[in-house]
UniProtKB/Swiss-Prot annotation:
Protein name, as recorded: Probable dipeptidase
Pfam families the record matches: Peptidase_C69 (PF03577)
EC id: 3.4.13.19
Protein's GO biological process: proteolysis
Top-rank EC class of the record's enzyme: hydrolase
NCBIfam families on file: C69_fam_dipept
GO molecular function terms listed in the Swiss-Prot or TrEMBL record: cysteine-type exopeptidase activity; dipeptidase activity
Origin species: Latilactobacillus sakei (Lactobacillus sakei)
Family: Belongs to the peptidase C69 family.
Residue positions of the active site: 10
Length: 473
């Protein structure tokens, strides 16, 4: 069993339907790993019927019977399955989305009374054990909570759920205790490896959910430092020097972009989990946050600050990001095209989020298959190569990369709109959308290959191994 600290350290952003520009709900996350290369695939898991199987985690041995019936769903499993599937994120055929997980850490006080369970539910299993079996975001919270109650939790995890109406965020922080909060429809939320949920209203089950006995657990063990509030973050979370350099600055930067009128400090321990943006948010806004690295501040590792400033805070977009995704459930479109999974391999700063319709029965070979050795015919490796080339001459290549991503974003919107319009005339929507996904993958792969060729050619002129020469020599 790999130590958890080597597994995942992510940034998550959620958007309610009335907070978005088009009525969509959105959940999103950068899946960050300990190593810079941790290959991922994009896959469609088929629906199952009359199954009689037992699930056994390759990561920690969690064992539980599987339901006989399960929905089709998309996922982004690891290339190396030796530590389990780690499917991470996806949308099922009922247009319910899940992203798991945001690693979170409880304090020693609460863990002393409810320690983590070594072979309990962990990140590797969450998507596989919940997404195929839920009809709504709220059902997802309940099913995940029921599994934790029965089998315990091996780790601290934050999980996002969404359907066309609701967005929920659940934090499992000890062996058996958790809470969940519905993101208000007109708000967004950002989480960054730190317990985020704040005050819980136990008289409002429509907007909050929690593990059985959590109030008694807290009061019985004298865990609440406040006499006036029940603040989950302050009871169960951490507030350390590491948090102020690794975690809170990411929330600060996202809120700085989405609410520039509000002045806050990057090391503040009181940044709110939920905010209402100063404008309606688009999928491009979510992409900007996921791609960000303290842009236009002295803390930008690619900027002009001092070396100390550029290394003070951990950025949102990293070379260690393996999979950056946005699960968008759209309203005001036919059910067949509501689910769009924007998937980005490679470093998010330099690479595009590619939109795939999730009502499909297969993914493109360049995303589904993953050769052991690098090849530019594979989407993961292609985008990793692009990121490395762009960063190698960032000043010279930055604008070309920005133009490439902008052109693809424009193309994506046009393609999605055309597909929305065409879907009503399709006898087999799943087959049609599967074909559209192949076209989308091909377009993005070709555009990326073209840019890569352009930058390699231009880069030869930037080599330090050169000299002013006579053109005839």
């Amino acid at each position: 069993m790999t130590d958890r600290i080597e597994l995942s350290a992510c940034t998550s952003m959620m958007v309610g339907k009335n907070a978005s520009i088009d009525g969509s709900t959105m959940i999103s996350r950068n899946e960050d790993r300990f190593y810079a290369i941790h290959p991922k695939r994009f896959f469609v898991q088929p629906a199952v019927h009359n199954r009689h199987e037992t699930y056994v985690s390759k990561y920690n041995g969690l064992t539980m019977p599987l339901p006989e019936e399960g929905y089709r769903y998309t996922s982004t499993p690891n290339g190396d399955l030796s530590d389990g599937l780690n499917e991470e994120d996806g949308i099922n055929e009922k247009n319910v989305a899940l992203s798991a997980t945001e690693s979170v850490y409880a304090n020693e006080r609460v863990l002393a009374y409810d320690p983590l369970i070594k072979n309990g539910l962990a990140e590797d299993s969450m998507c596989s054990l919940v997404l195929p079996y839920i009809n709504s975001a709220r059902e997802g919270v309940k099913l995940m909570g029921d599994i934790v109650t029965k089998y315990g939790s091996a780790e601290g995890n934050g999980i996002q759920y969404s359907d066309e109406n609701e967005v929920w965020y659940q934090e499992i922080v000890t062996g058996h205790h958790w809470v969940a909060a519905k993101i208000p429809d007109d708000c967004y939320a950002v989480a960054a490896n730190q317990v985020a949920i704040e005050n819980i209203d136990f008289n409002d089950p429509d907007n909050y959910m929690w593990s059985e006995g959590i109030q008694e657990f807290v009061s019985g063990n004298h865990l609440n430092p406040s006499e006036t509030e029940w603040n989950f973050r302050k009871i169960f979370g951490t507030d350390t020097e590491k948090d102020r350099h690794y975690n809170t600055p990411r929330v600060w930067y996202a809120q700085r972009y989405l609410n520039p009128e509000i002045k806050q400090e990057p090391e503040s321990s009181d940044l709110p989990f939920i905010r209402k943006a100063n404008r309606k948010l688009s999928v491009e806004d979510v992409q900007y946050v996921l791609k960000s690295h303290y842009n236009e501040t002295e803390y930008d590792p690619l900027g002009n600050g001092t070396e100390e400033q550029k290394t003070t805070y951990r950025a949102i977009s990293l070379s260690r990001t393996q999979n950056s995704h946005i699960c968008q459930i759209r309203n005001n479109v036919p059910d067949a095209v509501k689910g769009v999974q924007w998937l980005g391999f490679g470093v998010p700063t330099f690479c595009p989020h590619v939109p795939f319709f999730t009502n499909a029965n297969d993914t493109d070979e360049t995303y589904r298959e993953l050769p052991e050795k690098m090849t530019l015919k594979n989407a993961y490796w292609l985008h990793e190569a692009l990121a490395m080339i762009v960063e190698s001459h960032y000043g010279a290549f930055k604008q070309a990369d920005i133009d490439y991503q902008k052109a693809l974003s424009e193309w994506a919107r046009t393609k999605i709109a055309a597909t929305d319009k065409a879907i009503e005339n399709q006898a087999d929507a799943v087959a049609f959308l599967t074909a559209q996904n192949h076209e989308i993958a091909t377009h993005y792969n070709e555009a990326t290959t073209d840019l890569l060729a352009q930058l390699v050619t231009e880069g030869t002129q930037l080599s330090k191994l050169t000299f002013v020469m006579d053109k005839n020599l």
